[in-house]
Swiss-Prot record:
Keyword field: Cytoplasm
Native source organism of the sequence: Psychromonas ingrahamii (strain DSM 17664 / CCUG 51855 / 37)
UniProt xrefs under Pfam families: DUF496
Gene (name only): tmaR
Signal sequence segment: none
InterPro entries per UniProt: DUF496
Protein name, per record: Pole-localizer protein TmaR
Family: Belongs to the pole-localizer TmaR family.
Function: Pole-localizer protein involved in the regulation of several cellular processes.
């Protein structure tokens, strides 16, 4: 019975990891779009249109978004690794049960 509970736990964790990975990929995509938007915005702002401080603020915002993208990419890799480990545990459990 404990083995069955472990299988259920691992399967549920695997499904949760799938959802988290999809959510994380969406965050990467969204923040990448923001980085592109801010990069384009920087190209259009001219010194005679607005003060240099605005450019500095936008550059800082872009850097923040780039950092977020990097963090989400790292998190995605960690979640994928854990999902693969869960798949191995589940497969191993199924093989043990079949062998019984």
């Amino acid at each position: 019975m404990d083995n069955l509970l472990e299988l259920v736990r691992n399967t549920r964790r695997k499904n949760k990891l799938k959802r988290e990975i999809l959510d994380n990929e969406k965050k990467v995509r969204d923040n990448t779009k923001r980085v592109d938007l801010l990069s384009n915005l920087l190209e259009y702002i001219k010194p005679n249109m607005s003060p240099e401080d605005i450019k500095c603020i936008i550059e800082n915002m872009r850097d923040d978004y780039e950092d977020r993208v990097d963090e989400h990419i790292i998190k995605g890799a960690e979640l994928s690794k854990e999902r693969r480990e869960m798949n191995k545990k589940i497969s191993s459990f199924k093989l043990k049960e079949i062998a019984k």
